[in-house]
C-alpha cells in the first residue's frame, strides 16, 4: 500500500508541474505574438533608417570627403582592444537560449586572446551576468532589465559608453552579440560589428530617393550625429529581437516540458495499475490460503 501511495503522490506532483508548464507556455505564446510584431516593425524601421542614412551620407560625400574626418570610420590594421556587448535574458526556463549566446561569446574571447587582443565585456541580461560572475570573468558594465523590458532610452545608455570609448581610443572595436528571432520554433545567433564602420556599407551608390538637400558646413558632424542614432537603434533592435527570440525559446521549452510531464504521468499510471494489480492478487492469494487452511 505504501508503494501505491508513493506512486499516487508522484502522479499528483507531475500533474501539478504539467499544469504550471502549460500555463507558462500559454503566457509565452501571448508575449511572443506581441514581441514578434514589435520586432517586425522595428526591422522595417531599421531598414528605412539605413536607407535614409545611406542617401544622406552619399549626398554629403559629394560636397566633402567626410570619411577621413569621422572617427567612426577609423579602421585600424592592428587591433589591440575589443569591446563585446552581449544580450541574454533576465530569466531562465527558455531552453538553450542563453547558453547559445554565452557559448558564442566565450568562443570569441578565446579567438581574440589567441591573437593577443584584449577583450572587455558589457553584459546585458541577468543570466549572462550570473554566468560570467560565477566563472570569475570581469565584466566592464552590467545592465539588468533592458533585455526583459527594452526601451530606446535603455538602448542609448548601453551603447553610449561603448561608442564613447571607441571615439576616445579606449577600445579599437565594438561588437554586438545577441540571439535573434528567426521564427516561432528557432532562433539564431547574430554578431554585428558596430564600430568601426566599413565606408562602403554606408556611403555606397546613390539611391532612388527623391530627397534633395544641401548640407550646411561641418559635414562630418552631420554624419556623426546620424550614425550615433543608427548605433542607438541597432542596440534597441537587438534588445527587441532578443526578447522575441527569448519568448519563442521559452514557449518551446515549456511545450517540451508539458509533453514530457504527460508522458511521465502515463508511465506512472501504468506502474500504479501494475502495483495495484499485484496488491489485489496478493490479497486474493492470502484469502484463498486462509480458506484452504480452515478446511
From Swiss-Prot:
Record's GO cellular component terms: plasma membrane; proton-transporting ATP synthase complex
Which CDD domains does the UniProt record give? F1-ATPase_gamma
Record-linked InterPro entries: ATP_synth_F1_ATPase_gsu, ATP_synth_F1_gsu
One Pfam family assigned to this protein is ATP-synt
Q: Which Gene3D superfamilies match?
A: 3.40.1380.10, ATP synthase, gamma subunit, helix hairpin domain
Q: Cell membrane as a keyword?
A: yes
UniProt record, GO biological process = proton motive force-driven plasma membrane ATP synthesis
UniProt topology in membrane = Peripheral membrane protein
Mind listing the UniProt keywords for this protein, alphabetically? ATP synthesis, Cell inner membrane, Cell membrane, CF(1), Hydrogen ion transport, Ion transport, Membrane, Transport
Q: Where in the cell is it found?
A: Cell inner membrane
Q: Per its record, what are the GO molecular function terms?
A: ATP binding; proton-transporting ATP synthase activity, rotational mechanism
Q: How does it assemble?
A: F-type ATPases have 2 components, CF(1) - the catalytic core - and CF(0) - the membrane proton channel. CF(1) has five subunits: alpha(3), beta(3), gamma(1), delta(1), epsilon(1). CF(0) has three main subunits: a, b and c.
This molecule's function is given as: Produces ATP from ADP in the presence of a proton gradient across the membrane. The gamma chain is believed to be important in regulating ATPase activity and the flow of protons through the CF(0) complex.
The entry assigns this protein to a family as follows: Belongs to the ATPase gamma chain family.
Q: Which HAMAP family match?
A: ATP_synth_gamma_bact
NCBIfam families from the UniProt entry: ATPsyn_F1gamma
The protein, known as: ATP synthase gamma chain
Query: What is the protein's species of origin?
Result: Campylobacter curvus (strain 525.92)
Quote the gene name from the UniProt entry.
atpG
